[in-house]
Amino acid sequence: MNVYKRADFWAKKAAAAGYRARSVYKLAALDKKYSLLSRASRVLDLGAAPGSWTQYVLGTAAACTAVCAVDVQPIASDIQDARLQRVQGDLCAADTRARVACNAPFDLILSDAAPRTTGNRTVDTSASACLAAGVCAYVNFLSSDGGLVFKVFQGSEHLAILTHLRAHFGAVCSFKPPASRPRSCELYVVARFFRGTCGK
């Protein structure tokens, strides 16, 4: 199966299942491998639009699990659930973090956010690292032993992020789900068992 047919497979599967995007199967693979949602009663989804990861959490986690979904774009209006709190704003902005803080602490922080790509690997990798830093700015909203999962483009910056997180989490690794395009440089950082306050 070539790259484009494989991508089409995941997109068609997502549409048939009622999910907003094919990326839902990346989270499903992460959850299967790391049991992300097994103990999560409060989840923060950063860069959530159009909403497939939020859909997955609401449909898979325990019935009592609450989700705070953040994006500068509105989350799909037909995703309706009493457990869902929407926060519209730039995830990297201080005022957005202040609004999210009202819902903390979280057992799990998720982010599938990615920068607009230019086709220049160096530029795109750097932009991804900057966005990842914005996601990591929320880490102190985690409860003890909480988890953090986010997308980053592979490169020297991503290795530096892993090194930084290992000082604050009991287990840190990276993973490329089967639903990722084979030629994509995207990886997902999985940090588990938060030890406490993480300095900037």
Curated annotation (Swiss-Prot):
One Pfam family this sequence matches: FtsJ
Taxonomy, superkingdom: Bacteria
Reaction(s) the record says it catalyses: uridine(2552) in 23S rRNA + S-adenosyl-L-methionine = 2'-O-methyluridine(2552) in 23S rRNA + S-adenosyl-L-homocysteine + H(+)
GO cellular component, one term: cytoplasm
EC number of the protein: 2.1.1.166
Main location group: cytoplasm
Name under which the protein is recorded: Ribosomal RNA large subunit methyltransferase E
GO molecular function: rRNA (uridine-2'-O-)-methyltransferase activity
Family label: Belongs to the class I-like SAM-binding methyltransferase superfamily. RNA methyltransferase RlmE family.
Organism: Treponema pallidum (strain Nichols)
Function comment: Specifically methylates the uridine in position 2552 of 23S rRNA at the 2'-O position of the ribose in the fully assembled 50S ribosomal subunit.
Locations listed in the record: Cytoplasm
The keyword NAD is annotated on this UniProt entry: no
Keyword Transmembrane helix: no
Chain residues that bind S-adenosyl-L-methionine: G51, W53, D71, D90, D112
Residues annotated as catalytic: K151 (proton acceptor)
PANTHER family: PRE-RRNA 2'-O-RIBOSE RNA METHYLTRANSFERASE FTSJ3 (PTHR10920:SF13), RIBOSOMAL RNA METHYLTRANSFERASE (PTHR10920)
Keywords: Cytoplasm, Methyltransferase, rRNA processing, S-adenosyl-L-methionine, Transferase
InterPro entries given in the database record: RNA_methyltr_RlmE, RNA_MeTrfase_FtsJ_dom, rRNA-MeTfrase_E, SAM-dependent_MTases_sf
